[in-house]
From Swiss-Prot:
Disulfide bonds: none
Top-level lineage group: Eukaryota
Catalytic activity: an N-acyl-sphingoid base + H2O = a sphingoid base + a fatty acid; an N-acylsphing-4-enine + H2O = sphing-4-enine + a fatty acid; an N-acyl-15-methylhexadecasphing-4-enine + H2O = 15-methylhexadecasphing-4-enine + a fatty acid
Protein name: Probable acid ceramidase
Family according to the record: Belongs to the acid ceramidase family.
Coiled coil (UniProt feature): none
UniProt GO MF annotations: fatty acid amide hydrolase activity; N-acylsphingosine amidohydrolase activity
Claim: Calcium is one of the keywords in the record: no
Annotated signal sequence range: 1-22
Organism: Caenorhabditis elegans
GO annotation, cellular component aspect: lysosome; membrane
C-alpha cells in the first residue's frame, strides 16, 4: 500500500474511532444527577487556574502565539505523546510520522490559508516539533469534539448567558491513575484564555488549547458570543478529499478558524448569523450564537454548504433557553450518549429566575453533561462582559463519555 493510502486510512481511524458506535462501551447504569438545589459549587476563584494571554493581531502572524507556545511547551508535547502512543495500535507502522508528513505536504501546497498558516509555523518554531504533526493537531480539533452548549435569557430580559462544556478525548488511552482519558487530562493542562487585541483595543475574548490558533468558544463583550459543537459523525470524506488536494484554491473554511474570523469581522449578532449561514465549510457543525439584545439566541445546524435547520430562543417549549449537544435537534441522540434530555431537565429545574453564572455552571457540572471527557466549562455573559473558564473533573461514579 502506498504511503498516502496508509496515511488516509490512519486519518479515518483516528477521526472515526471517537465517534464510532462499534468502539463504544455501554456506560454503567448511572442515573443523571442534576446538582440544582444542592450545595453551592460555583467558585469564581477556580477560574483563575486557566491563565489569560494577550494576542496582538497587529503583530506579524508568526509572532502572535509564540508566547503561549513557550509557556506550554512541555504540556503540548504531552498531548503529542498521547496521540503518538494511541497510534501504536497499528504494528509496524509509524502512524504519527506518516500523518505528519502528509499534513506537512498539504501545508506546503498552500491548502491552509494565511494568517493561520504562518501562525502555526511560528508555534512550531518555538515547540521544536514536526510541523505536520502540529498542523494535524489543529485539524484534529476541527473534527472531534463532544460538547454541551447553552444560551439562556434571564427573566427580566436584560441579560443573556452563554456557556459550554468542552468534551474531548474519548477512547484515547485510559489513564488509570487519573481515572480519566489520557487525552482529556492532557488537554486540561493546555486550556487557555486569550484577549485578542487589534489597533490597541480589545477585539474579543476566547478560549482555546495552547498550540491551536483558532478559538473554541468566544465573546465580543456587549456584542455577541459563540460556541461551536461538532456533529457526532464528522464529514470525514471531505477531510480525506482535502488531504488529496480536491479543495485547493477555494474559499473553503476550517470551522474554528472561521469562528475567529467571525469575531474579527462582525460586530453584532445579526452579522454573525448571516456569515455563519453563508460560509462554505470543510465539515458540518452546530453554531450556538448569543447576542446582546433580548431574544438573540440561535442554534444554527450547518452542513458544509448551507443551514439545515435553525432553533431560536422563544420558539418552542423551552423558549427561554437552548441546549445543544452533538446531534441534530430533530433526531434522537445515541442511547448511550443522551446528554440532551438530562440537560434540558436540569435547566427546567433551575428555572429562568435563576439563570446566571452560578446557575448555568451548576447545570453543566451535573452528570451526564459532566463526564470523563469534559475538559473545561466556559461561562459567558454577553451583556455584562463576564468570561470564565473552569477545569472540570467528574468524580466517580461517572459516565466514560
Amino acid at each position: 500500500m502506498k504511503p498516502v493510502a496508509i496515511s488516509l486510512s490512519l486519518l479515518l481511524l483516528v477521526t472515526l474511532l471517537p465517534g464510532s458506535e462499534q468502539r463504544k462501551v455501554d456506560n454503567p447504569d448511572f442515573q443523571p444527577n442534576c446538582l440544582v438545589g444542592g450545595p453551592d459549587i460555583y467558585d469564581p476563584a477556580q477560574s483563575e487556574k486557566v491563565l489569560w494571554f494577550d494576542v496582538n493581531l497587529d503583530l506579524p502572524p508568526r509572532q502572535r502565539f509564540q508566547q503561549i507556545a513557550k509557556a506550554y511547551k512541555k504540556e503540548i508535547h504531552a498531548v503529542f505523546d498521547v496521540l503518538n502512543y494511541f497510534l501504536t495500535i497499528i504494528p509496524g507502522v509509524n502512524a504519527w510520522e506518516l500523518i505528519g508528513n502528509m499534513t506537512a505536504s498539504a501545508l506546503d501546497k498552500g491548502m491552509i490559508m494565511n494568517p493561520y498558516r504562518d501562525e502555526v509555523l511560528g508555534i512550531a518554531e518555538v515547540l521544536d516539533v514536526p510541523l505536520g504533526n502540529l498542523v494535524f493537531l489543529n485539524l484534529f480539533y476541527e473534527m472531534s469534539r463532544f460538547c454541551t452548549s447553552i444560551v439562556a435569557q434571564t427573566e427580566d430580559n436584560k441579560d443573556l448567558y452563554h456557556a459550554r462544556n468542552l468534551d474531548f478525548g474519548q477512547l484515547f488511552v485510559w489513564d488509570i491513575a487519573a481515572q480519566s482519558w489520557g487525552l482529556t487530562e492532557a488537554l486540561k493542562k493546555v486550556s487557555v484564555n486569550i484577549n485578542f487585541f487589534k489597533n490597541g483595543k480589545l477585539l474579543f475574548k476566547g478560549s482555546t488549547l495552547a498550540g491551536h490558533v483558532g478559538v473554541l468558544t468566544a465573546m465580543k463583550p456587549h456584542k455577541f458570543s459563540l460556541s461551536m459543537n461538532a456533529k457526532v459523525q464528522p464529514d470525514i470524506i471531505n477531510v480525506a478529499k482535502w488531504y488529496m488536494g480536491a479543495y485547493e484554491n477555494t474559499d473553503l473554511q476550517f470551522v474554528m478558524y472561521f469562528d475567529r474570523w467571525l469575531f474579527e469581522n462582525c460586530d453584532d449578532f445579526q452579522c454573525a448569523r448571516e456569515k455563519i449561514a453563508g460560509v462554505k465549510l470543510l465539515t458540518g457543525a452546530y453554531f450556538i450564537l448569543g447576542g446582546a439584545n433580548p431574544g438573540e439566541g440561535s442554534v444554527l445546524v450547518r452542513n458544509t454548504t448551507s443551514v439545515q435547520f435553525e432553533r431560536k430562543l422563544f420558539d418552542g417549549a423551552n423558549d427561554w433557553f437552548l441546549l445543544q449537544t452533538n446531534y441534530d435537534p430533530d433526531k434522537d441522540p445515541l442511547f448511550i450518549d443522551n446528554r440532551r434530555d438530562p440537560g434540558n431537565a436540569c435547566m427546567n429545574k433551575l428555572t429562568r429566575a435563576n439563570v446566571g453564572m452560578k446557575g448555568i455552571f451548576t447545570v453543566l457540572s451535573s452528570k451526564p453533561n459532566l463526564n470523563k471527557t469534559t475538559v473545561h466549562t466556559v461561562i459567558m455573559s454577553v451583556t455584562k462582559g463576564y468570561f470564565e473558564t473552569f477545569i472540570q473533573k467528574c468524580p466517580n461514579p461517572c459516565w466514560a463519555f
